[in-house]
A protein has these predicted regions:
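Q-loop/switch helix immediately C-terminal to the Walker
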Residues: 84, 90-106
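Walker B catalytic motif
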Residues: 158-159
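ABC ATPase C-loop
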Residues: 146-147
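ABC ATPase NBD coupling module
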Residues: 64-79, 223
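Helix-to-loop junction immediately C-terminal to a conserved catalytic motif
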Residues: 48
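The feature captures the beta-strand-to-loop junction immediately N-terminal to the Walker
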Residues: 33-35
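Conserved ABC transporter NBD signature motif
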Residues: 56-63, 109
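Conserved structural motif at the start of ABC-family nucleotide-binding domains
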Residues: 2, 16-19
Length: 237
C-alpha cells in the first residue's frame, strides 16, 4: 500500500500542494484528476521522487521512502512514465525494455511485452528509439518499459499528452487490458473522461487539496447529486 501523509509543497512561495493525505490500496487502478494547476503533476513527481515535499511522509508498505532519491525509490518498487517519453539515440526498443527489466531477458520476452501494448513486436523490437517514431508509438513503448518492471506502484503522468485521437483510443485499450491483468497499483494523472471511466478509484484535486476521493461509482453518484441540487436551486430562484 502507498500512503501519503500531510504532503505539502511550495514553489516560488506559491502553495502547490496543501496537506494532502492519501491511502492507495494494492491492485487498484487509480485516476487522480482535477483542473489545470490543481497540483496533479506535482503530486506525481513527489511520488516518483523527482520532487521532494516540504513536509509530510510517503510510506510504501509501511516503509518511509520520503527521502529516497529517484533511483532508490525505483528499486523499492515505484515505477513511472514521464509526461513526454524520452528518445534515446542509438538505443533500440529491445535495449530499453531489457534495461528497464533490470535482468537478462530475451527478444521473445520483449516481444511479448510489446504485444501487450498493441505493437506488432517483430516490427518494433529492433527499431531505434528516435524521432522517426510517432508520439503514440513512443508512449506505448514507454508503457511496455514500465510494465516489464512489475513495480508495486506505477505512475503515469498525463499519458494522453502529445498523441493523436487514433493513438489515444489505442492507449485506452492498453490501459483497459492492463486493468484486467492488474498487479500492483497503477496511478494515472489525467482529466480525460475515457481514462476516468476505467478507474477503480478517483481522487479529485483542487487548489492543491484533495476535494473528493472514493470509488468511481461513489464519485459519479456525488457528481450526479451535485448536479441535481444545482438544478433544484436554479428552479427555486
Amino acid at each position: 500500500m502507498l500512503e501519503l501523509k500531510n504532503i505539502s509543497f511550495k514553489r516560488d512561495n506559491k502553495q502547490i500542494l496543501d496537506n494532502v493525505s492519501l491511502k492507495l490500496d494494492d491492485d487498484k487502478f487509480v485516476v487522480i484528476t482535477g483542473p489545470n494547476g490543481s497540483g496533479k503533476s506535482t503530486l506525481a513527481k513527489i511520488i516518483m521522487g523527482i520532487e521532494k515535499p516540504d513536509s509530510g511522509q510517503i510510506l510504501l508498505d509501511g516503509k518511509d521512502i520520503t527521502n529516497l532519491p529517484i533511483n532508490e525509490r525505483a528499486k523499492s518498487g515505484i515505477g513511472f512514465a514521464f509526461h513526454q517519453p524520452v528518445r534515446f539515440k542509438g538505443i533500440t526498443v529491445f535495449d530499453l525494455i531489457k534495461l528497464s527489466a533490470g535482468k537478462d531477458i530475451n527478444k521473445g520476452e520483449a516481444c511479448n511485452i510489446l504485444s501487450k501494448v498493441g505493437l506488432c513486436a517483430n516490427e518494433y523490437v529492433d527499431r531505434e528509439i528516435s524521432s522517426a517514431l510517432s508520439g503514440g508509438e513512443l508512449k506505448r513503448i514507454e508503457i511496455a518499459s514500465v510494465a516489464v518492471r512489475n513495480s508495486k506502484v506505477t505512475v503515469f503522468d498525463e499519458p494522453e499528452a502529445g498523441i493523436d485521437l487514433w493513438s489515444f483510443n489505442n492507449l485506452i485499450k492498453v490501459f483497459t487490458d492492463m486493468r484486467q491483468s492488474l498487479k500492483g497499483t497503477t496511478i494515472i494523472i489525467s482529466h480525460q473522461e475515457k481514462i476516468i471511466n476505467i478507474a477503480d478509484d478517483l481522487i479529485l484535486l483542487a487548489d492543491g487539496k484533495v476535494e473528493k476521493m472514493g470509488s468511481k461509482e461513489e464519485m459519479f453518484d456525488k457528481v450526479q447529486k451535485d448536479r441535481a441540487c444545482c438544478k433544484l436551486e436554479g428552479g427555486n430562484n
